[in-house]
């Protein structure tokens, strides 16, 4: 028996109304008071708005450097396992990834005016020849920046001349550097005062972080460009 025309219309209207209510509940339309469908499958933790990540600047510094300053980060090696890093103006000058670091002293020479890398080398201070290091740092030109990061042992092969040259570059700690100490330093040829950029931790069995080695050091900052470099 077929439904009469008016009854058909009533059934159609009711069907449309029910469908609209169901869709509104699932999609959470305006004023529905129901959560949206995707929220039904989302954990409370994931719905929390993530805190904005702190912005990092060149070499990972938390603040930008002033004009006419160079951003840097120097990290010493950790024991004899993790190599050191030297970053300048967001460019990695020395690291294990670049395969240009080694046991001893890792040194990058930089033009203090332009900020361009002049040369980067590692010097073995346990079994190497200290004369190689002396030939590297003796002829530095005025205004050359010197970045140093230790790895494993920075001092066994050091002699008085080596310590004196680093002291003239602005180091306070070169004269007392010893076997397996951790050391990071930034100096320059021609400075009149001691550098503010230096950290040193003595190798001591009472305070070492690693078995046989002190903690790794990390130093960052902004270096003013030199006025002259020849």
From Swiss-Prot:
Family indicated by similarity: Belongs to the FAM3 family.
Chief location bin: secreted
Swiss-Prot/TrEMBL keywords: Disulfide bond, Lectin, Secreted, Signal
Subcellular location: Secreted
Lineage: Eukaryota, Metazoa, Chordata, Craniata, Vertebrata
Protein name: Protein FAM3A
Database matches in PANTHER family: UNCHARACTERIZED FAM3
Job of this protein: May act as a defensin against invading fungal microorganisms.
Signal peptide feature range: 1-33
GO function term, MF aspect, one: carbohydrate binding
The GG-type lectin domain, residue ranges: 68-226
Pfam families, sorted: ILEI
One of the record's GO cellular component terms: extracellular space
GO biological process: antifungal humoral response; antimicrobial humoral immune response mediated by antimicrobial peptide; ATP biosynthetic process; calcium ion homeostasis; gene expression; glucose metabolic process; insulin secretion; mitochondrion organization
S-S pairs: 59-87, 65-222
Tissue: In similar amounts in testis, pancreas, adrenal, placenta, brain, fetal brain, liver, kidney, skeletal muscle and heart.
């Amino acid at each position: 028996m077929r439904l009469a025309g008016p009854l058909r219309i009533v059934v159609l209207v009711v069907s449309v109304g029910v469908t609209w209510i169901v869709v509104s509940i699932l999609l959470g339309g305006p004023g529905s008071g129901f959560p949206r469908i995707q929220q039904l499958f989302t954990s409370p933790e994931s719905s929390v708005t993530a805190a904005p990540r702190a912005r990092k600047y060149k070499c990972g510094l938390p603040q930008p450097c002033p004009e006419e300053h160079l951003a840097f980060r120097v990290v010493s090696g950790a024991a004899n396992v993790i190599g050191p890093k030297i970053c300048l103006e967001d460019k990695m000058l020395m690291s294990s990834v670049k395969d240009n670091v080694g046991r001893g002293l890792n040194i990058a020479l930089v033009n203090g005016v332009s900020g361009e890398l002049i040369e980067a080398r590692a010097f073995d201070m346990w079994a190497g020849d200290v004369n190689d290091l002396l030939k590297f740092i003796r002829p530095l030109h005025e205004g050359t920046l010197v970045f140093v990061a230790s790895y494993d042992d920075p001092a066994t092969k050091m002699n008085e001349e080596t310590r004196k040259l680093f002291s003239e570059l602005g180091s306070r700690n070169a004269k007392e550097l010893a076997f397996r100490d951790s050391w990071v330093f930034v100096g320059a040829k021609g400075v009149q005062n001691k550098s503010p950029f230096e950290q040193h931790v003595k190798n001591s069995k009472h305070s070492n972080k690693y078995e046989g080695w002190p903690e790794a050091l990390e130093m960052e900052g902004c270096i003013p460009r030199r006025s002259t470099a020849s």
